[in-house]
């Protein structure tokens, strides 16, 4: 069956295309067929670029026949979150405010993917303007392929759902406080927030200039590494872009993790955990130990303050960016999104400065923790996804339940505040019906995505969580 191509990894598809066992046109059509069949149920795509994709696929096949093979992404379909500008193709930002915007420029990321020979098949749904977790989009909620009554998190909700359902093999998400990693966690896929500055933000609609990141989302760690390889690197068009040399992310994947030290925080990251999450997390640490890693305790004293500080910084900067739109078209925003942005406009400058000072403290603490280990492992989400119809779904990605005290939707904001890379990958499923994905999150040192990818790949070689298929077919 042609659609079975959609369940192969990017590495496998790339080799089939390179050796001309299948054509880029065949692969593209397999994914477009699934999009047409399943997207009406999931609502992951906002725009489907059928004609564009077929034309690009034919061109890729012609180049490959002529011996002009561009690399492992040549002929591979992808669909980015609809915050990335695509020249001549609508970029809605998930909002009625900009639903008719057709950019006259290209984001650096999509430009680099075009140069690598990847094929754009559409643009993916998201929380309006990437404003956080939940289900609020100007184009309707994205449903979770593992259970349509549950959220797909946010704000890169379409990306997580589309990869899980194999509507696309690759996506680009954005992440200000967990918006790549949350959707990856609840969809059973892989999401990487790179080091701040590693991937260009030119042509990406901002939410928070000092916290925004863009990065790969995929079905496997190896696929994420292939995608990162294509998009990483300095960009003079982005003032936040870093100049560090981009290493080979793919070659070291098979080196194993013998001798690596994995830090496990002694507090703040596991409070209020659902029992199934705790069990999966402990089993994940056991697998890493079996593979040769050493588990060591670490402490990040003020980690519990990361989410409130991150929210204050992010929404203050977002309110500044959207100030004119709010003044001119307030009725086009979702009411809850508008409320958050308008409220943030009244935050005190002194509070913003305090949050930035806390950010400096967290950076020192995270760097000190990573001085004693190679990476840190925490649960991606302490609890399970929220139901779409639940009261908390519009404000948070997960069921609040009996979680104590000030509830943290995830353990993600600290990586945005400090700029360290963070990788999320599946590590189990809940015991209820339907079984829902559970994920682990790995933090690394600045510009050391390679170690995170290496550990994640080793874990996936030893487990099969990433091979499970959601019940959408």
Regions found by a protein language model. Give the residues of each.
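An N-terminal boundary/leader segment
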Residues: 1-54, 290-292, 468-473
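Conserved acidic residues
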Residues: 43, 169, 374
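Short helix-loop capping/hinge segments that flank enzyme active sites or metal/cofactor-binding pockets
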Residues: 73-93, 251-266, 313-367, 379-383, ...
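Long amphipathic alpha-helix in the N-terminal Rossmann-like dinucleotide-binding domain
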Residues: 51-61, 117-118
């Amino acid at each position: 069956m042609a659609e079975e191509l959609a369940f192969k990894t990017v590495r496998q598809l790339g080799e089939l295309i390179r050796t001309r066992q299948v054509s880029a046109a065949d692969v593209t059509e397999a994914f477009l067929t699934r999009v047409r069949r399943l997207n009406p149920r999931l609502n992951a795509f906002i725009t489907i670029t059928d004609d564009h994709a077929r034309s690009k696929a034919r061109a890729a096949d012609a180049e490959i026949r002529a011996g002009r093979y561009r690399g492992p992404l040549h002929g591979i379909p992808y669909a980015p979150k609809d915050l990335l500008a695509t020249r001549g193709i609508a970029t809605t930002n998930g909002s009625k405010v900009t639903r008719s915007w057709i950019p006259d420029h290209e984001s650096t990321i999509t430009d680099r993917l075009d140069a690598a020979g990847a094929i754009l098949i559409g643009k993916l749904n998201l929380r309006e303007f990437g404003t956080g977790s939940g289900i609020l989009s100007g184009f309707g909620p994205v449903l979770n392929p593992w259970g349509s009554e549950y959220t797909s998190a946010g704000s890169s909700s379409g990306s997580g759902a589309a990869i899980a359902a194999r509507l696309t093999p690759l996506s680009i998400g954005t992440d200000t406080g967990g918006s790549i990693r949350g959707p990856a966690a609840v969809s059973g896929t892989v999401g990487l927030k790179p080091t701040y500055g590693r991937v260009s933000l030119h042509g990406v609609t901002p939410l928070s200039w000092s916290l925004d990141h863009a990065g790969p989302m995929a079905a496997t760690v190896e696929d994420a590494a292939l995608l990162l390889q294509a998009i990483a690197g300095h960009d003079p068009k982005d003032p936040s872009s870093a100049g560090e040399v981009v290493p080979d992310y793919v070659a070291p994947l098979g080196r194993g993790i013998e001798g690596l030290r994995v830090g496990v925080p002694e507090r703040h990251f596991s409070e209020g955990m659902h029992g199934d999450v705790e069990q999966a997390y402990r089993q994940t640490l056991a697998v890493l130990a079996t593979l040769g890693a050493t588990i060591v305790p670490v402490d990040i004293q003020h980690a519990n303050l990361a989410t409130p500080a991150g929210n204050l910084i992010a929404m203050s900067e977002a309110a500044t960016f959207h100030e004119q739109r709010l003044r001119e078209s307030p009725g086009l925003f979702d009411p809850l999104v508008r409320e958050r942005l308008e409220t943030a406009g009244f935050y005190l400058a002194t509070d913003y400065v305090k949050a930035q000072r806390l950010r400096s403290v967290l950076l020192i603490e995270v760097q000190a923790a990573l001085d004693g280990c190679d990476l840190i492992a925490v649960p991606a989400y302490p609890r399970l996804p929220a139901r779409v119809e639940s009261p908390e779904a519009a404000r948070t990605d997960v069921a609040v339940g009996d979680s104590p005290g000030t509830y943290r939707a995830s353990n993600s904001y600290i990586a945005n505040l400090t700029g360290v890379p963070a990788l999320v990958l599946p590590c189990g499923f809940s015991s209820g019906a339907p079984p829902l994905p559970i994920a682990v999150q790995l933090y690394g040192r600045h510009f050391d995505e390679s170690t995170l990818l290496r550990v994640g790949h080793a874990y996936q070689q030893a487990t099969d969580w990433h091979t499970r298929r959601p019940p959408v077919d």
